Design a protein with these regions (language model features):
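Ubiquitin-like/PB1-type beta-grasp interaction modules and other compact soluble beta-rich domains
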Residues: 2-7, 19-160
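Extended effector regions of multi-domain proteins
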Residues: 10-12
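C-terminal motif of bacterial Sec signal peptides marking the signal peptidase cleavage site
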Residues: 14-18
Length: 160
């Protein structure tokens, strides 16, 4: 009798564990976290890796605009930049590439910069430090092959 009770208790525990399962570690749909979410305006950072994986971060701000460099810093997206005679250039975003002996290595992938306004991407004419974003606009980074003469922008920001 005791063996049957132990077996029944173990079976019941397994059924309860299976039905009541733990919280999933990842979600089916990506979410966008927002720093300073209560602010009146929001701008976004959208990152697309060479693998196609994407990341989006949101930053709330009070003024009419937010500078691209302030957006990157406040978003919490990891990035590394180097200063050149023309200004700052981004060499690494969200830990890609894992190492970079040169910011612009010959025949290697690089970060292409885009600016989203009005629901459409445009290539950035200047560096990220000169971009000023308004409410619901985005800064986009796409890690692309050096052989790509006209890189595609990352996915549009999901405005929340």
């Amino acid at each position: 009798m005791r063996k049957h009770l132990l077996w029944a208790s173990a079976t019941l525990a397994l059924v309860i564990a299976a039905c009541g399962g733990s919280t999933p570690t990842s979600q089916a749909t990506p979410t966008s976290s927002c720093a300073n979410a209560g602010a009146a305006h929001h701008a976004y950072v959208v990152v697309q890796h060479l693998s196609g994986a994407t990341l989006q971060k949101c930053v709330g701000f009070a003024g009419d605009t937010i500078n691209g460099e302030a957006l990157m810093v406040q978003s919490g997206v990891e990035y590394q930049a180097q200063t050149f005679s023309f200004g700052k250039a981004v060499c690494q975003v969200d830990n890609e590439p894992t190492t970079y002996p040169k910011c612009f290595p010959d025949n290697k992938p690089y970060w292409s910069l885009f600016f989203e306004t009005g629901g459409a991407w445009a290539s950035a004419a200047n560096g990220y430090t000169t971009v000023n974003l308004h409410d619901k606009e985005a800064l986009g980074w796409h890690y692309v092959q050096a052989t790509d003469p006209s890189p595609a922008p990352p996915p549009l920001a999901t405005v929340g």
